[in-house]
């Protein structure tokens, strides 16, 4: 049995210099659709043609290749975080919440790769 139970949702988070330009590129070339863009959060989400997989575009001043961070959906981010911390998984800072949207936390695998867990607060 796994430490946490994941939902059937996965967000691939990419850092981009220009979210509007990046969104248009993904729409034009890959057929993705923009579903939400929140300027205050510096975040845009797009549906992909893969069920349960969302592309997230986050603002950054400097992009470095290979910056993809998988964001795994969970039913309760606080419970999932506690379960992972209980088995010594390292987290980066506090859990962040954007009211009415998402609650998320960043953690690391044994090689230092960043991963995230996220609870959907929109419903």
Language-model segments: residues:
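Conserved short beta-strand elements that form part of the metal-binding/catalytic scaffold
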Residues: 33-68, 114-120
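Vicinal oxygen chelate
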Residues: 1-5, 14, 81, 85-123
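Short secondary-structure junctions
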Residues: 31-37, 91-95
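N-terminal beta-strand motif that seeds the catalytic metal site of vicinal oxygen chelate
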Residues: 1-23, 52, 68-70, 121-123
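Short hydrophobic/aromatic beta-strand element in the GNAT-like acyltransferase core
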Residues: 13, 43-45, 54, 71, ...
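Mid-chain, well-packed structural core segment of small domains
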Residues: 69-84
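Short glycine/proline-centered loop/turn elements that form peptide/ligand docking sites
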Residues: 20-22, 38-44, 97, 123
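Conserved active-site tyrosine of GNAT-family acetyltransferases
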Residues: 22-29, 84, 112
């Amino acid at each position: 049995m796994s430490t946490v139970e994941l939902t059937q949702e996965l967000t691939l988070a990419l850092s981009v210099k220009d979210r509007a330009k990046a969104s248009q590129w993904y729409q034009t070339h890959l057929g993705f659709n923009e579903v939400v863009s929140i300027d205050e959060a510096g975040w845009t989400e797009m549906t992909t043609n893969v069920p349960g997989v969302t592309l997230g575009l986050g603002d950054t001043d400097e992009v470095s290749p290979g910056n993809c961070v998988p964001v795994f959906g969970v039913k309760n981010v606080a419970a999932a975080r506690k379960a992972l911390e209980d088995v010594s998984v390292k987290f980066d800072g506090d859990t962040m919440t954007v009211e009415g949207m998402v609650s998320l936390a960043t953690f690391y695998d044994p090689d230092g790769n960043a991963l995230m867990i996220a609870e959907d607060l929109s419903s």
